[in-house]
Amino acid sequence: MIKKNKEELNDMEYLVTQENGTEPPFQNEYWNHFEKGIYVDKLSGKPLFTSEDKFESNCGWPSFSKALNDDEIVELVDKSFGMIRTEVRSEKANSHLGHVFNDGPKEKGGLRYCINSAAIQFIPYDKLEELGYGDLIKHFKK
């Protein structure tokens, strides 16, 4: 399982996960990344999203239509910056991940999880078994 301690986070990872920051759009690791695999919480290593549910939203951040397991995600009301939004945090590490909006693809349920790349780590499909995520292979189309 992939995971980090808070002390191992770089400045952007710390800003995003611990201080509820937001990385720049279109200037982050996964905004246009569509390789087959899963995305895990950078701190706890818990699986959060799959490439099967990732889509291009043109917002500049990785976007997913659903979480892999709702039990790994916590949603909170966020009233910062004069807006009312739904913040998404990881349940295990309590890291800020991003926000969820109701403007996603209707055919996939209508949600858009807008997630900071700095809060997640990508695990390629062909490494799932080796890195302890083999039980998640069932979530992928053959």
From Swiss-Prot:
Keyword tags: Oxidoreductase
GO cellular component assignments: cytoplasm
UniProt key word Nucleus: no
InterPro entries in alphabetical order: Met_Sox_Rdtase_MsrB, Met_Sox_Rdtase_MsrB_dom, Mss4-like_sf
Gene Ontology MF annotations: peptide-methionine (R)-S-oxide reductase activity
Catalytic activity annotation: L-methionyl-[protein] + [thioredoxin]-disulfide + H2O = L-methionyl-(R)-S-oxide-[protein] + [thioredoxin]-dithiol
Active site (UniProt): 114
Residues in MsrB domain copies: 2-125
GO biological process: protein repair; response to oxidative stress
EC number from the UniProt entry: 1.8.4.12
PANTHER family found in the cross-reference section: METHIONINE SULFOXIDE REDUCTASE, PEPTIDE METHIONINE SULFOXIDE REDUCTASE MSRA_MSRB
Sequence similarity: Belongs to the MsrB Met sulfoxide reductase family.
Annotated protein name in UniProt: Peptide methionine sulfoxide reductase MsrB
Organism name: Staphylococcus epidermidis (strain ATCC 35984 / DSM 28319 / BCRC 17069 / CCUG 31568 / BM 3577 / RP62A)
Lineage: Bacteria, Bacillati, Bacillota, Bacilli, Bacillales
